[in-house]
Every structure is written in structure tokens, then in C-alpha cells.
């Protein structure tokens, strides 16, 4: 766990949950697993605060617990899961593009609340969608339920592990913490709910003022019927989203390298194997040419012969994204996911080198990568770059850890005159170094955004107050002159300052998302490589 990762986790926890949760979370990230009382002692927080903070972190899957043989419960932070909070906007946007506004709000609610029952999600989303609709229109619960079922069928949401049913006749004491389990076949099983109803609008403030005083909310009594899915909680399946992001990156890479038809064939193959292939598998399941032809999108008019030519072309490509696994069924083909991730990571490294050091350094990097091991003289000759410039460029990349130097001595004394000095590229090491820098970059972006917001806090508060007054006056049917007077409460220089702030914050937000795309590619490649070793 690097300092850059810990700092980024700290910023994310503080932004999402506040100071107390951040304090407990970062303490667990630094120290590893600890029991409750040790956490309270080390952080100087009250036992009640620690319990509440752990409850929040466990509910959002950011902390897990283990029960030891002696019955001691220890809590452990999931740093990698904390870092996934960076990707929340991307998860939500992806769901919007695939399943529309309803799917977007379902995933948003699950991410914001950690875990929820299906009935609670459906009601909340229906209410939110009804709020945005025109007067007189409402969102039906059944429509939201159908969107939820589609998300579960494609594994974007999954059930949370449950407390197993205990035998009431068992005389032994209950365990200090429940051991949650779930059967794999039940993970995407949607409970049969007959949710009948429509979304409700919140009463506006003027209605409350004109009408009767608000009735007190009735307390839940024991006689109140529980919902049919009571105790069945759902969460977002982040691995499935990562699988989708990886597939999109591969399709985009094939489109850039070859053409749109090739990318559509690869997209079809990935879509056919997305449920059957585990998220960390190095290859997809073998697919026959006939199966691929039958599964091509409707209206995509290419003949079987043309498809076979494309598949042969893809299989013969030096990048080896597609491999041939047999000749049955017109030819069996697989997508080499590990090779694809390695190529995407290498392309990312090349792009970074070109941006930082120029095209000549990128040429040397590609050359060393292709030839595996090269002496300085060979680099000069192959790259056709003068000796002095080549030496400077190699040193720059060596000092930044993009390339490494390997010594091969001719004699045991390692004398420089009798030693070969070979330049080589360790892609895994370079990817780790770049990933570390990406974490630093995102932490800097978050800090900058927080600074910009803090500097203009008073102006933002004033703007929000003016907007609230405008909204309430428009609702009561105020005249145009009155509205204009309220608008003029914010002066022209203040309005310009607000525009600049908005533009800067939008740039910083966009930069965060773009850096996270690089983080995703590098993390996927490192994870895939570690599984193969």
C-alpha cells in the first residue's frame, strides 16, 4: 500500500462520509485488521463513534470482518474497494447508456446506499422519476421492476450474502459475528414481487403552508406487514462493470487498428461470452464461426464468407487479440483478453512517453520493446539517432523507470569494460510506476477542486440562496420585474467569477474521469499478469 493510495483513500472517504469515517477507514488501511477496542484506543474515538463508522464502512463494502478461533472479531479495510468510488460516475453513466434513466437511478441509489432491498429501490426510483415528469404523469412501479430484473439478468446487480438460517434447537451460544453466505445460483435470482403502485411527488412548501399542518409520520408497528423481499439485499456488481469497460476498450482498439466491421465482430464475440466467461479469465470461451454469424446484429449484412475472411485476418494480426482454437463448426475462435490488456497498457505507456519526452523517445521505447534487449550502440543504429541524443533520451527514460538496464558480465569481477549493458522494457514494472503516478494525479485534482470550492464558498452560498428565492417566487407566480430584481442581487463580476469556477470544476471533474480510465487499464493488466504468474 503506497502513500499515494492511502492519501487518495483518505480524500475519497472524507468527501463521501465525513471526518470520523475517514479517520477510522484510513487507520484500518494503515494498520491492517484490528479488533473494535484497539481501533477505538488507537484513534482516540469513542466506542460508539467507531461502531457507527464501521457500520457505514461495512454497509458500503469498504470494510470486511473475520472471526478468529478465540471469538475475537477483527475488521479489515478494503483499500481497492475504496478506490472504486472514483469510478461511481462512470458506472452510473454506463447504466444510463445501456438501460436508460430508470437503470441509471437504480444503480445510483445502490451506490449511494451500499445495500438496499429491491422493493425499497423500486419505490425510491419511481418517486424520483415522478418528480421529474410533467404534472399528472407518474412512473409505474412495474416499469422500474422490469429495469431492475434486466440489470440482474445481465449481472450488473447481485444479491448480498445472507445470514444462514440457524437451527433453533442448537443449545450453543451464538457466534460473535454472523458468517454471511450465498449460493452462487441465487446471486442473480430476483424475488417475485407484486409491487403495485406509482411514484409519489413530494408536497411543495406552498401547499404545506396553505393546507393543513403536516400529519406526524406514523411509527412502524409490529403488526405492519413486512415486504416479501425483507432481508434480501442487493448491491452493484462492480466486476461486471469492469468486464464491460474492458470489452469496450478492446472493441475500440480493434476499430482504431482495423475497421468498424472488425470491431463489430469482436463486440459480438464478447457479448456472446460476457456471462459465461469469468471476469478474471485470460481467454473467452471458444466460439464457432457459425455461432458468431448467427449472433451478428440484425441488419449487419455481411456474408458468411466475408465473416470467415475477417476472422482469419484478426487471427493473423500481430497483436493476437483473436486466436484460433480449433476447426470444428467452421473454425473455433477465442479472444485473448490478457494479450489485449497487455497491448492496451503498452499503448498507454507509449502515449505517455510521447507526451512527456517527444516522438524520438517514443521511437526508442518501441524499438527496445520490440527487440527485447539492446545495447546503446544498437539503439543508435536501429533508431538512426545521433549518439549524444540517444544517450540523453535513454537516460531520461531510465531515470523515470520507463526502461531498465540489465548488466551481463563476461567475467566474475563485473569490470565495466568486460560487461554488456542492455536496455530492456519491463512492462509490468513500468505499468506499476505509471499507476502510482495516476493515483498522485487524482489526489492532486481532488485537492485542487476542493480548494476552488472553498475559495468561492461565500459566492456559491449566495448563488444558491438567490436560486432558491427565484424558484419559490416563480412557483407563486411573481412578476417579471420582481424576478429581475432578485437576479440583479448577483453582480456582473460575481456572475463572471461563478462561470469561471464552474468551468474550472468541470475541467477537474473531466480530468479525474480520464485519469481513472488509464488507472482501469493499468490495474486490469497488472491483475491479469499476476494471475498468470
Curated annotation (Swiss-Prot):
Q: Where is this region: Disordered?
A: 161-183, 197-228
- Provide the alphabetized UniProt keywords: Antiviral defense, DNA-binding, DNA-directed RNA polymerase, Immunity, Innate immunity, Nucleus, Phosphoprotein, Transcription
Gene3D superfamilies from the entry? 6.10.140.1450, Winged helix-like DNA-binding domain superfamily/Winged helix DNA-binding domain
Provide the protein's localization.
Nucleus
GO-annotated biological processes: defense response to virus; DNA-templated transcription; innate immune response; positive regulation of innate immune response; positive regulation of interferon-beta production
Query: What would be an example GO MF term here?
Result: single-stranded DNA binding
Q: Which InterPro entries match?
A: POLR3C_WHD, RNA_pol_III_RPC82-rel_HTH, RNA_pol_III_Rpc82_C, RPC3, WH-like_DNA-bd_sf
Q: Please list the residue ranges that the record marks as compositionally biased, kind Basic and acidic residues.
A: 211-222
Pfam name, any one: RNA_pol_Rpc82
Question: Which of the residues bear the PTM Phosphoserine?
Answer: 194
Q: Looking at the record's lineage, which domain of life comes first?
A: Eukaryota
Paired cysteines (S-S): none
What does the UniProt record say this protein does? DNA-dependent RNA polymerase catalyzes the transcription of DNA into RNA using the four ribonucleoside triphosphates as substrates. Specific peripheric component of RNA polymerase III (Pol III) which synthesizes small non-coding RNAs including 5S rRNA, snRNAs, tRNAs and miRNAs from at least 500 distinct genomic loci. Part of POLR3C/RPC3-POLR3F/RPC6-POLR3G/RPC7 heterotrimer, coordinates the dynamics of Pol III stalk and clamp modules during the transition from apo to elongation state. Pol III plays a key role in sensing and limiting infection by intracellular bacteria and DNA viruses.
Concerning its family, UniProt says: Belongs to the eukaryotic RPC3/POLR3C RNA polymerase subunit family.
**Quaternary structure (record):** Component of the RNA polymerase III complex consisting of 17 subunits: a ten-subunit horseshoe-shaped catalytic core composed of POLR3A/RPC1, POLR3B/RPC2, POLR1C/RPAC1, POLR1D/RPAC2, POLR3K/RPC10, POLR2E/RPABC1, POLR2F/RPABC2, POLR2H/RPABC3, POLR2K/RPABC4 and POLR2L/RPABC5; a mobile stalk composed of two subunits POLR3H/RPC8 and CRCP/RPC9, protruding from the core and functioning primarily in transcription initiation; and additional subunits homologous to general transcription factors of the RNA polymerase II machinery, POLR3C/RPC3-POLR3F/RPC6-POLR3G/RPC7 heterotrimer required for transcription initiation and POLR3D/RPC4-POLR3E/RPC5 heterodimer involved in both transcription initiation and termination.
Q: What is this protein called?
A: DNA-directed RNA polymerase III subunit RPC3
Lineage, opening ranks: Eukaryota, Metazoa, Chordata, Craniata, Vertebrata
Q: Which gene encodes it?
A: Polr3c
Amino acid at each position: 500500500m503506497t502513500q499515494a493510495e492511502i492519501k487518495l483513500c483518505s480524500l475519497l472517504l472524507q468527501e463521501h462520509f465525513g471526518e470520523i469515517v475517514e479517520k477510522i477507514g484510513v487507520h484500518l488501511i494503515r494498520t491492517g485488521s484490528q479488533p473494535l477496542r484497539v481501533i477505538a484506543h488507537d484513534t482516540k474515538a469513542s466506542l460508539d463513534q467507531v461502531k457507527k463508522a464501521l457500520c457505514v464502512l461495512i454497509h458500503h463494502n469498504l470494510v470486511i470482518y473475520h472471526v478468529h478461533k478465540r471469538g475475537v472479531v477483527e475488521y479489515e479495510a478494503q483499500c481497492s474497494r475504496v478506490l472504486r468510488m472514483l469510478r461511481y460516475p462512470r458506472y452510473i453513466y454506463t447504466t444510463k447508456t445501456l438501460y436508460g434513466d430508470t437503470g441509471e437511478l437504480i444503480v445510483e441509489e445502490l451506490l449511494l446506499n451500499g445495500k438496499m432491498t429491491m422493493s425499497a429501490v423500486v419505490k425510491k426510483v419511481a418517486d424520483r422519476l415522478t418528480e421529474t415528469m410533467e404534472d399528472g404523469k407518474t412512473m409505474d412501479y412495474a416499469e422500474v421492476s422490469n429495469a431492475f430484473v434486466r440489470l440482474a439478468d445481465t449481472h450488473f446487480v447481485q444479491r448480498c450474502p445472507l445470514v444462514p438460517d440457524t437451527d433453533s434447537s442448537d443449545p450453543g451460544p451464538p457466534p460473535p459475528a454472523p458468517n454471511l453466505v450465498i449460493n452462487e445460483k441465487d446471486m442473480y435470482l430476483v424475488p417475485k414481487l407484486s409491487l403495485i403502485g406509482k411514484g409519489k411527488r413530494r408536497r411543495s412548501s406552498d401547499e404545506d403552508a396553505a393546507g393543513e399542518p403536516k400529519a406526524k409520520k406514523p411509527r412502524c408497528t409490529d403488526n405492519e406487514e413486512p415486504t416479501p423481499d425483507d432481508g434480501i439485499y442487493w448491491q452493484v456488481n462492480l466486476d461486471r462493470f469492469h468486464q464491460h469497460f474492458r470489452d469496450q476498450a478492446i472493441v475500440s482498439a480493434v476499430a482504431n487498428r482495423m475497421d468498424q466491421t472488425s470491431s463489430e465482430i469482436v463486440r459480438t464475440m464478447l457479448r456472446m461470452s460476457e456471462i459465461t466467461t469469468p471476469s478474471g479469465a485470460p481467454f473467452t470461451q471458444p466460439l464457432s464461426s457459425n455461432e458468431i454469424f448467427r449472433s451478428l446484429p440484425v441488419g449487419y449484412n455481411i456474408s458468411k464468407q466475408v465473416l470467415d475472411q475477417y476472422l482469419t485476418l484478426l487471427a493473423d494480426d500481430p497483436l493476437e487479440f483473436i486466436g484460433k482454437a480449433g476447426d470444428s463448426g467452421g473454425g473455433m475462435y477465442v479472444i485473448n483478453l490478457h494479450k489485449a490488456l497487455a497491448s492496451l497498457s503498452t499503448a498507454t505507456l507509449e502515449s505517455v512517453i510521447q507526451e512527456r519526452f517527444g516522438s524520438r523517445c517514443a521511437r526508442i521505447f518501441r524499438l527496445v520493446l520490440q527487440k527485447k534487449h539492446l545495447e546503446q550502440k544498437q539503439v543508435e543504429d536501429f533508431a538512426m539517432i545521433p549518439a549524444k541524443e540517444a544517450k540523453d533520451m535513454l537516460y531520461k527514460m531510465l531515470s523515470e523507470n520507463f526502461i531498465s538496464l540489465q548488466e551481463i558480465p563476461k567475467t566474475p569481477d563485473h569490470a565495466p569494460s568486460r560487461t554488456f549493458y542492455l536496455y530492456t522494457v519491463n512492462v509490468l514494472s513500468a505499468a506499476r510506476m505509471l499507476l502510482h503516478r495516476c493515483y498522485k494525479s487524482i489526489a492532486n485534482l481532488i485537492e485542487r477542486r476542493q480548494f476552488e470550492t472553498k475559495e468561492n464558498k461565500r459566492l456559491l452560498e449566495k448563488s444558491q440562496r438567490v436560486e432558491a428565492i427565484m424558484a419559490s417566487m416563480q412557483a407563486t407566480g411573481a412578476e417579471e420585474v420582481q424576478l429581475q430584481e432578485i437576479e440583479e442581487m448577483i453582480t456582473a463580476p460575481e456572475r463572471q467569477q461563478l462561470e469561471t469556477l464552474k468551468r474550472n470544476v468541470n475541467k477537474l471533474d473531466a480530468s479525474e474521469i480520464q485519469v481513472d480510465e488509464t488507472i482501469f487499464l493499468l490495474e486490469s493488466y497488472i491483475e491479469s499478469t499476476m494471475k498468470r504468474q
